[in-house]
Amino acid sequence: MAQVAPTGAPTDAPPAYPPPPQQAPPPQQPGYGQPQLGYGQPPPQLGYGQPPPQLGYGYPPPPQNNNMMMNNTVVVTAPAPAPANNVVIINQKKDNCCRQAIPAHHIAAAILCLIFNIFFPGIGTIIAGFAVFCCGNPGADGGSKVGTMCINFWIGLLQIGTVWFFFLGWIWSIMWGAAFIGMSADYHSGGDTTIVATGGGGTTVINN
């Protein structure tokens, strides 16, 4: 039978199982100052005395931001053409009551009719009435010229018939000849000018 050691007796016997031998770290490779991970060394933490890792040493490059490149695209368009301005000039003559009775002749014809009325009362008035068809009242229609001729023909006859009555016809014919010279300004004038300007801002009408 095996003997049982008494309680409290010192046990100086070696342990039944020896401890496992510890493995030594592998030797460091040249060019790497830090030991490799996975051999009993904790991984280094950034921000605690360790420099940040450099690009190109086992770290992928950062992704490029394609949205920034798309947002920087500049589109240049041609400016819209300015609206064209159109200017229309209209010259027209407006009839008046004096023009219907007193024809508008050239200044030379008006002076000639005045001379006839001075020396031959009423004759210059009749000549001015018939001359309206060839060289008087520019721009007037045919009916207006016929009316002017009839008025001056009958006025010329009245001037001839009243010249013996206190020289009334003679004075009347001189005043009528002076009116021929006054109406000659209407013959030389271009009439009323109307300027119509159209553009992007609307239509502008100017009457001169």
From Swiss-Prot:
The annotated regions of Pro residues compositional bias extend over 12-29, 41-63
Q: Which residues are glycosylated?
A: 71
Name the keywords, alphabetized.
Answer: Cell projection, Cilium, Glycoprotein, Golgi apparatus, Membrane, Transmembrane, Transmembrane helix
> What are the Low complexity biased-composition ranges?
30-40
Which sequence ranges are marked TM in the entry? 107-127, 163-183
Among InterPro entries, the record links this protein to: SPEC3/Stum
Question: Per UniProt, what is the membrane topology?
Answer: Multi-pass membrane protein
Is Ribosomal protein given among the entry's keywords?
no
Localization annotation: Golgi apparatus membrane; Cell projection, Cilium
**What ranges does the record give for the region Disordered, renumbered to this chain?**
1-63
- The UniProt record lists the keyword Transmembrane helix: yes
Query: GO CC: one term?
Result: Golgi membrane
Q: Which PANTHER family match?
A: PROTEIN STUM
Q: Which family does it belong to?
A: Belongs to the SPEC3 family.
> What is the name of this protein?
Protein SPEC3
Species of the source: Strongylocentrotus purpuratus
